[in-house]
Amino acid sequence: MVNLRCPVCAGALENRAGAYLCPKNHSFDIAKSGYVNLLLNSSQGHHGDDKLMVRARRDFLDKGYYDRFIAAVADAAAEFTPPEATVLDAGCGEGIYSLAVLRAIEKAGKHGELLGVDISKTALQYASKRSPDFTLCVASCAHLPVEDGSVDEVLNIFSPFVPEEFARVLKPGGYLLRAYPLREHLWELKALIYDTPRDNPPTPLTTEGFTLVETREVRDIIRLSCNEDILSLFRMTPYYYKTGAKDQQKAEQAQELSVKLAFGLAIYQRD
């Protein structure tokens, strides 16, 4: 069962006819697209990934380029969930990993409920179309609107890593799955754009409050045969927003590109 809490007073939220309500009568309407906004002061400017990044990621991932990694995440998630599981996808984006995880849990003969949290309303609008079985919230990974010790598993797939908050919402002995880029991930994309590309720095894996159970690596080479897919890959990464117009033109002019994918997946258990 997904146990949401009020972002104002931390009281338990109940779904009552199209809105979530806490005992102190703080009320949060459910949008037509199916998510509830639990981000305080969310009217003050744009939050999270913008429409260009979200659409680029959706278009790129829906073409199957990351399927090997998505399957690895889903299989690991299903392996480490109990028979009846509540899974939190912290930074769920447009929901492609969330859906794969739910399907893998069902395939393993288990039952899962999935809560997707993202700070981007645009991303959740797309996520709501993936499956009617998601519970979706606009919220920050740093302030999850989830009751203490109520989640069996947390997914952290290329989103802000906030271990103290993940430890708070996880049950004792629950699992955290964290994705991170390996040294050579997307090297050829960086070499296309930058004169002096750099390796990805190593990711520190020791995390207070958690025991590292194991790490897994997934590698692949994808071949992009049209400019549309090259631009989608570029625009779904932070590189696009850190690159000047002159270097962006290199991606805009490229017609084909082979790119190495190199993912790490760290599996932790809450102490």
Predicted segments — roles?
Residues M1-H47:
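N-terminal auxiliary segments of SAM/dcSAM-dependent transferases
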Residues E84-G93:
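Conserved class I S-adenosyl-L-methionine
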Residues H46-A72, A76:
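Class I SAM-dependent methyltransferase Rossmann-like catalytic core
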Residues V218-D271:
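Conserved Class I S-adenosyl-L-methionine
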Residues G173-R183:
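Conserved beta-strand signature within the Rossmann-like core of class I S-adenosyl-L-methionine
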Residues E94-G109:
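Conserved SAM-binding loop of SAM-dependent methyltransferases across substrates and taxa
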Residues P163-Y175:
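A short glycine-rich, Lys/Arg-flanked "PGG" loop and its adjoining helix->strand segment in the class I
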Residues S120:
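Conserved SAM/SAH-binding beta-strand->alpha-helix loop
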